[in-house]
Amino acid sequence: MASQQHSVPCISRSPPEQPLQVKVVGLFKSSSFQIAKSAAESLKSNYPSNFEDPIIIPVQEFAWHQYLQEKKRELKNEVWEYSSYVMCFINDKLLGDALDLQKWAHKVWDIVDFKPPALYEALTVDYSAKFLRDTKHNFVFLDISIDLYPIGRLIFELYSDTCPKTCKNFQILCTGKAGFSQSGIKLHYTGSIFHRVVRNGWVQGGDIVAGKGDNGESIYGPTFEDENFSVPHNKRGVLGMVNKGRHSNGSQFYITLQAAPYLDKKYVAFGQLIEGTDVLHHLESVPTENERPIQNCVITASGQLYA
């Protein structure tokens, strides 16, 4: 549903003193993002002297929800019930969603940019595939249940160009392709649990030995070295390796619940949650006793995506 249209700098087709800047921010795999992107590009191509090149910002699902919350805090009542997967701006002033941009382009600039829904869907599929390929990163998933009730999937982008060894360890532990360790430990996250929830800190899992939180094993042996500390803990959803001190990474991992700069230079972060906003919220909300979940939070399946 289109949101109420907001006032924007231009109300006629007469050339403005300065070219207008259209910005589109949205969920990269939503058709509404493609609709807005197409409208913004049509405005530029039809009126090149009236418009700057459009700023097109595709974001992942988790990042979109974070962005939307920030905008709701910034703009307050103006977008409190905003439900679209895209936001369109003219000279940094909110216009509305994709339909609002189409209507504005038609009313003010006589641009008709309406394509069949099937075409937008096809454009979305092609754009999404290219968007993920262009990252040159690997993607993995964890399916989660709480007390046998499936709550959904966490999807992570692994920064394999920055931390290749750490990412390979996590990726193969997700797929289970390494089989068993020399000590007989099954090197697979499936069946393991989230054993710790630190309020406003992180959720922790990956003890594939006994699930107590005091053990784990990597695909390289019991532990491996800290690869680097290039990735900062500067937001919610950062994925990192738990350790017992320098160079003691195994299989345990954490997902931050907010920015945690105190973890920088001490723990190796190597990825980011990109989908699973509600799932992470469920995990951080489970009742605990001494930071251990009272409910059984299990990884029921894990593997690689988009390979």
Curated annotation (Swiss-Prot):
SUPFAM superfamilies reported for this sequence: Cyclophilin-like
UniProt-listed Pfam families: Pro_isomerase
GO CC terms, sorted: cytoplasm
Domain PPIase cyclophilin-type stretches: 141-304
Role played: Probable inactive PPIase with no peptidyl-prolyl cis-trans isomerase activity.
Family: Belongs to the cyclophilin-type PPIase family.
Protein name, per record: Probable inactive peptidyl-prolyl cis-trans isomerase-like 6
Organism: Bos taurus (Bovine)
Taxon lineage: Eukaryota, Metazoa, Chordata, Craniata, Vertebrata
Gene (name only): PPIL6
